[in-house]
């Protein structure tokens, strides 16, 4: 077998009949499979041992040779080679066809490659191949030309003969008629009888004329067809063809079926054809030129690849190895077999019958029919159902052909090559493990024992608990006591991987150190649930065991959960306290006025109370019960750093040192909370709402090493659970309080609603206005009930505590429980003007319940659809970006993009940009950031973290130029500096990081949270697409629904207002041609934007617009933005539009992820004029390749090619990738492979997918070339030492090792039998 690590490209091409015969180990002559009595393969059949190898190791068919020592011998009785049975997985056979057949992929694909090559319409091609028409394969022009006059004379003679015969017959008939009439007249017959005779005579004469005319027409037809006869001409009329062959057989050859196609291809001159097509393209116009372009693609493919087009017509069909189309015996003596065997059987049967018919010399019509059936059976074998009705098996199920084995989710690519099942894995239900550290998980004992079995067995033998592996295995199976001790030892420091399906982003698989636990459930740390999206309502997780040292190192260093605290999408921590923990910390840090032991200042004769000399003293007081943790106290602190303001005031420039004392007015709870934070973190003296907790952890992640952050969140988790228990927050029916003012509020609004209803009945309002008014009224009512509810609830109400702390839920839910449900939507997404006035606490009426179900059901249906759609989007994103890998440190480009940091308010203050988190944060600065005085605040090449951004804002800088992947100059992949900081580590991205896949996951993972619906904006008007469909529309570069025109030029607007349409004309400032936008529907409203005078209003007559400005409401078409404003603008447009959808759902994704995808969409250039290059006009070329080729051509003094950037949707971009393996495993497998084979494509194996498919290490991380191809150089001392070793003769090593390949030596290939 090939070792995958020793080749670095993979080529696909057309196999000729010669290739097929060379691969083959013998011809399959019989359709038999196995003998049903002996169950041994039949000789020369589809499972024949002579061809494919023995069915049992080292045993021939007849049993003469058994044992390894006969290795390689071919038995003289049965002809079977003595070898391993596994050769039946790799040895191929073939079927010699009695007549050639065409390959259905090349004939039936769209476009038909055979049709383009031979310039035949697919319909005609089908007629020829399936024996419905003859085709002329060659004409002897010269001979025909030389003898034309002779032939014409012969033809004239023949026609003369026909005419003479006709005239003679007419003459005779006329005379007979005369005689008959004369006779009748003599007899004195009536006029009636005479007329009948005359009519009869004339009818016969007409028939004679017609017959002669038909004969003449036929001769004319034959002659004209013959004189115009040319190769590739179709003749559908069988009789005409027969006549031509009889008369002029020596001047031309013609045939039917694949043989004729084969002849045409043989006579086909590729170079001449390519030249003439190029000529047409240079000088032609319109349809002709287009057709020539399409044909040239196919012709040039054959010309450049050196493929022989003969490969499209097969003389022999390969038979794949039998183990890949097995036959298994079921219980009950029946057999189950692969569909391929059926398809092969049909081919062999028909082929054998055809051979017999040809040998018998059967009539042509029978032979042709058999050839047609053979062609159809080969078609079914290659791609069943591509043409006509598919061949069906039992139960009318279409049989799976060779193409179906590759296609789709169940095909070879996606089922076996890209996703495999692995051993050393298990799965179980998860339960919470609050006692675990962040990097630990609880593994059930039994599962651990099974997973680590080989390790345990080896260790048992090492420790002499067992004599050999076999007895060790027995000990493990019987679970002896020693086994558990050994298991503890083996499991230590050996991380395991936990995975929860669906794995939407890379944090869906993380490594943990296992702790053995009783029971059968896996225990999971509560803080990693967010990343896995896990909860404990019955979720299951899978465990995998990394075996090799490298795998363990990777798991420990890169995948350990404590190293994955930050989200790769936004760079913000994911391991945050949630739910109970938030409640506990919120409770702990609340200050309750007037609680036990509160600080009282000195008054009169009372000294001050509630003052403590240290936290320890306060804790003693709390333990005695004289102080509550939530009471305000004064305490002297020495180990906690004071807040920044206090530190500056008390300790001045020198700053606080551990041990310096200061007094804090706070609560004991807050002191306890601050003791959880790392030493030297400023004291936080406020109530810990979830947002505050998040901000603190965020800050820790920016300033402290990951390990500190991990320890801190663990401490917070423990304290959170402890105090959540102590707080006694529970929910009961008694906690849901209905506000007493609810009835009067609703009565008041009911009156207002009645007024509107009356106006409607009087006709003062139309239906829509009434609905809008009612919706407004009831929205106000709902809000007011909410207000009343809030005032009515006491602060210590548990429901309010849970909502206020940010643990879970929101106020709307509280309002629904205790206030009123409010307005609900109908299935169309519009508000129903009758509100639900009851709360869930009171219970709904039947009508309210009914209208409430609409929304609930729609929600569930949406969720199901969304999951599938979102998964498919992620798959396409991964596919388009999988080869974007960080390839170098810095591409040295000067380009970048400008991002806003802040906006200057009219009063001169800076308003921080709300999206700074996803735009400027974590980027590399492209130019020095300079303030107004000219001081450099942040230098070029600096990473912009939170401190740097704060410094820039403090210096009054509003925008900076940053490096971006959109402007990166690296040819394949991107460079680290343009990408900037890796969101997941908080440091500059490593070389070898697969940033494309991270980007795809970051965009796809929140996809399930996006909405499915298209919003109705304000009732009427075009629907604005939103949510997931909008993201797909953008990434697929489709023309959006409700497309808005954009200004092609800068100028003044003339707006003409028609009855149903607007007409907008722009008069350019530079005096160019006016641009007219006609028939713009009024349903699309005019766009509101800022005008030169600073006002915001609708576009109106006489306004001045900038180039690229949107004129109507709706979405601009990205292709137009590209045409009008160029690639830069369309990139920014796409990033902005995608972000808008995610921001609407409150999802934070960094711009750089979207930029990676957008970069892939704009990678290609379409060739307009090929100049002196080899590019074909209209083809899509990678920009880097285009520029390189142009440089080369210009250097040689040629004419460069002209191209135009194109925006491709992600599906199209994935299929247009240079890697045919990656494209084939994505979609349209047969089309991609057909194309790749014709072009003799090479896959350079640059991306990830290709390497996964062939089983190489992926070129990312340490698999990238600069890490893989490291040569170790010995030091001088080592060199000197090397020469002191006595040299051995080479032959010691040569027989077994030779030039080492670096591959492991498979021991079972060495026959040890000789030494026994």
Swiss-Prot record:
Disulfide bonds: none annotated. It comes from the Bacteria. Pfam families: RNA_pol_Rpb1_1 (PF04997), RNA_pol_Rpb1_2 (PF00623), RNA_pol_Rpb1_3 (PF04983), RNA_pol_Rpb1_4 (PF05000), RNA_pol_Rpb1_5 (PF04998). Its cofactor is Mg(2+); Zn(2+). Its EC number is 2.7.7.6. GO terms for biological process: DNA-templated transcription. InterPro entries: DNA-dir_RpoC_beta_prime, DNA-dir_RpoC_beta_prime_bact, RNA_pol_asu, RNA_pol_N, RNA_pol_Rpb1_1, RNA_pol_Rpb1_3, RNA_pol_Rpb1_3_sf, RNA_pol_Rpb1_4. Zn(2+) 2 binds at residues 891, 968, 975, 978. The keyword Transferase applies. GO terms for molecular function: DNA binding; DNA-directed RNA polymerase activity; magnesium ion binding; zinc ion binding. Induction: 6-fold repressed by starvation. Mg(2+) binds at residues 535, 537, 539. Binds 1 Mg(2+) ion per subunit. SUPFAM superfamilies: beta and beta-prime subunits of DNA dependent RNA-polymerase. Keywords: DNA-directed RNA polymerase, Magnesium, Metal-binding, Nucleotidyltransferase, Transcription, Transferase, Zinc. One of its GO terms (cellular component) is plasma membrane. Gene3D superfamilies: 1.10.132.30, 1.10.150.390, 1.10.1790.20, 1.10.40.90, 2.40.40.20, 2.40.50.100, RNA polymerase II, clamp domain, RNA polymerase Rpb1, domain 3. Zn(2+) 1 binds at residues 60, 62, 75, 78. It catalyses: RNA(n) + a ribonucleoside 5'-triphosphate = RNA(n+1) + diphosphate. Belongs to the RNA polymerase beta' chain family. The RNAP catalytic core consists of 2 alpha, 1 beta, 1 beta' and 1 omega subunit. When a sigma factor is associated with the core the holoenzyme is formed, which can initiate transcription. DNA-dependent RNA polymerase catalyzes the transcription of DNA into RNA using the four ribonucleoside triphosphates as substrates. This is DNA-directed RNA polymerase subunit beta'. It comes from Mycobacterium tuberculosis (strain ATCC 25618 / H37Rv). The lineage of its organism: Bacteria, Bacillati, Actinomycetota, Actinomycetes, Mycobacteriales. The gene is rpoC.
